[in-house]
C-alpha cells in the first residue's frame, strides 16, 4: 500500500514485473525435451539440449542480476523480506527431502524385495564403497566444514577467511564433480541395465547435479564477495 506522497509505508518488497519466471519455465521445458530426445537418439536433439542449457544459464544470470540489484543497490531486502526468503528456503529444502525420499524408496523397494532373490543382481559389477565413493563422501563432509568456516568468518567480519573458505569449498565441489564423472566413465553398467543401474544413476546423478548447481551458486557468492558485497550484519540476498 502506498500513501499519497509516493512513499511505501510497509517493509514488503513489491516485485516489478519480470520475464524470468516464464523464461525459466520455457528453459526447463526445452532442457527436459532435449534430454528426452537425446536419450531416444532423435535428430538434432543435441542442439535442443544445448539450447536448453544455454537458456537456463542465461535465465540464472539475469535473474540473479536483478536480485543482487534489489538487495545491494535498491535496498528492497528489508528484515521482513529476509524472513520470507528464509521460509522459502526451508520449504525448498523440505521439497528436496521428499524428492530424494522417492529415489531411496525406489532403491529399498527393489533391494529389500528383489525379483531375482538376490541384491544386487548377480550380473552387475558394483563399485567398492570404500574406494571413490568414500573419497567423495569425505570431500562432501570437508566442503561442509569449509563453507561453515567461511560463514562464521563473515559473521565476524573476517573477509580474508570468508573468501578463502568459499574458494576452498568451490575447489572441493569441482573435485567431487570430477571424481564422480571419472566414476561414471569407468562404471561396468549403464543407465538401462536393470533396476539397480537405474536407481543408482538416478539418485547419484541428481545428487551430482545439486553439487554442480551449488558450486555455481558459491562461485557467484565468491565473485560478489570479491567486489565488496555481503556484510557481517547483512549477508542474505
Where are these regions (language model features)?
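...captures the hydrophobic TM-helix bundle architecture rather than a specific catalytic motif
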Residues: 1-237
Amino acid at each position: 500500500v502506498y500513501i499519497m506522497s509516493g512513499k511505501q509505508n510497509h517493509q514488503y518488497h513489491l516485485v516489478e514485473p519480470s520475464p524470468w519466471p516464464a523464461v525459466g519455465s520455457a528453459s526447463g521445458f526445452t532442457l527436459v525435451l532435449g534430454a528426452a530426445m537425446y536419450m531416444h537418439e532423435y535428430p538434432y536433439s543435441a542442439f535442443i539440449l544445448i539450447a536448453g542449457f544455454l537458456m537456463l544459464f542465461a535465465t540464472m544470470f539475469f535473474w540473479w542480476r536483478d536480485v543482487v540489484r534489489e538487495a545491494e543497490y535498491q535496498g528492497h531486502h528489508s528484515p521482513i523480506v529476509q524472513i520470507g526468503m528464509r521460509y522459502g528456503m526451508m520449504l525448498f529444502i523440505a521439497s528436496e527431502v521428499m524428492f530424494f525420499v522417492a529415489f531411496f524408496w525406489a532403491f529399498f523397494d527393489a533391494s529389500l524385495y528383489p525379483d531375482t532373490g538376490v541384491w544386487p543382481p548377480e550380473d552387475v559389477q558394483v563399485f567398492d564403497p570404500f574406494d571413490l565413493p568414500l573419497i567423495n563422501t569425505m570431500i562432501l563432509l570437508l566442503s561442509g566444514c569449509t563453507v561453515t568456516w567461511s560463514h562464521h568468518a563473515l559473521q565476524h567480519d573476517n573477509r580474508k577467511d570468508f573468501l578463502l573458505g568459499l574458494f576452498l569449498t568451490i575447489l572441493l565441489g569441482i573435485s567431487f564433480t570430477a571424481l564422480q564423472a571419472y566414476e561414471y566413465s569407468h562404471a561396468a553398467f549403464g543407465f538401462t541395465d536393470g533396476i539397480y543401474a537405474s536407481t543408482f544413476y538416478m539418485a547419484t546423478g541428481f545428487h551430482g547435479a545439486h553439487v554442480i548447481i551449488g558450486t555455481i551458486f558459491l562461485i557467484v557468492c565468491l565473485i560478489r564477495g570479491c567486489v565488496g558485497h555481503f556484510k557481517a550484519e547483512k549477508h542474505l540476498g
